[in-house]
């Protein structure tokens, strides 16, 4: 059986290896995460030099080794050049890479996750602005977690399974959110259970935004919010939605996202 194989993949991690090689992690729809050596990739004239940088999508020809595979050829398909033109978008892209490294598995197909990851990179490159970048990230987190079956539930109570809709007519209205229970909680039903650790309280605006994350594209709040709520929407509400998704993802995956902290500091300066 041949130990040479081909796959489409995107470079999600890279580091120096030996005198002139590069050790890269490739995310492939067919094989998940692949760790491979790019021989001579750090030499100035190497054809693999630019093709093994982060975010570069290649058609790879690889040789399967015992512990590390080896890149024989790489033909670039796309490289998301727009991400590098804005430091916030670049940090956001690196944030999604950290998510994929946490969700990805070796030697198993993850086609849906790959397609969502590359689609959300495209949106960061072409659609994201300083005003909506946190909304795009919140939706990317939701979609990617959903591809692996661990997205939070924002429409039904995690205890009673009853549908919960945001109440914009009562300013004091709140709904709970518990990472341990996997979603939102009707505060009235939670009284019978006693204290729920790490539970947060969400406003009607926050719940409304979170309930829209399952849509294919990022919705415009001014298009779906009731009239009474439209004037109260602020860009900061998308930040809070992303922060909740980040909090949930980090608890589910047991990892923190360093690029997200970097994005926070740069976004505050830009905005």
UniProtKB/Swiss-Prot annotation:
Signal peptide: none annotated. Pfam families: RecO_C, RecO_N. The keyword DNA damage applies. InterPro entries: ARFGAP/RecO, DNA_rep/recomb_RecO_N, NA-bd_OB-fold, RecO, RecO_C. Keywords: DNA damage, DNA recombination, DNA repair. GO terms for cellular component: bacterial nucleoid. One of its GO terms (biological process) is double-strand break repair. The keyword DNA damage applies. Belongs to the RecO family. Involved in DNA repair and RecF pathway recombination. This is DNA repair protein RecO. It comes from Synechocystis sp. (strain ATCC 27184 / PCC 6803 / Kazusa).
